[in-house]
Amino acid sequence: MAFILGENSGGSYTVSDYVDEPELIVDEIVSIVQDAAIENVFYSDDGETTASAIIFKQRVSPFLSESPHEVAEFEEIPTADIRVGDDKVEKAFKIAEGLRVSYEMIKDNRIDLLSRGVEQLANEFLYASARQGLDRVKAATDEHSQVVSATTPWSTVTAEIGQDVLRACAMVSSALVDGDVDDERKAALGYTPDTIVMHPSVWYNIIGNKTIQAAFIGANSGDNPYFKGFQPYKPWGLDVAVSQYVDPKQVFVLQAKKPGGKKFLDRPQVTPLYSPYGDSSIGGATMEYRADIMERSIRALYDPKAVARIQVG
């Protein structure tokens, strides 16, 4: 659906209105980007920080170095060490973009151009955010061999999509600790995959797949996602998250918000419209106004094995 400026604020404004009431454009941009970042599926919100870099340790085990001991009366209770990985460092990253509104756009009331500009600015911001988050996840799945190759490309209607997804689920749920353990039953990291992330085009390949459709013949036909769409259908018991910013050749299976965390030096901020080169009735020396969006944040992958990637094509 196309974005139409003014819909979210319940009014129909001219370009001049946005210049006269500079805060209006802030609400419009925030309405698009708020809670829309696909990386939020992979990263928990770890709050604010003032540091430009963080040192962290990846999770290597859900257990201490030793099991509890049976102790005799008056015997000292033994202690065990916390198992941690090597130190890793992630630095802050700033993304920012600005949108210009010309004097001519104001005088000619080119609300269509302003609508496109606001939508494109928000999309650029979301894309940059997604790339920062997803590129790290992809690199981690390669590093830790958390990759499943599809038996057959998913664009093929006879592809064994379900088997590929279940292999990825098994990979996440059976991910093992690094190093030795005192009990093999403690070797699993204990993740529970609950979410599948994909490009919208991949979803349509799924609901058109012959094997998937066969499951809805007869009594289950009323629940067929072919007709009902995404919700409330949960394939393989997984929540479905789709985004145009995910590579169409990749699908991610994960425990939501478990792989990593994101700390903010500055949460996403949008400026009201302002004239950058001197305020005047015509927009300063360059006869323009602008609005900016920026964010400074740090992303860290604490549990890289909580996600698996399926190469679907």
Range-by-range predicted roles:
Residues 25-95:
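Assembly/oligomerization interface modules of large self-assembling protein complexes
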Residues 103-181:
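Alpha-helical scaffold segments that mediate packing/assembly in large oligomeric complexes
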Residues 1-38:
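N-terminal alpha-helical "arm" segments
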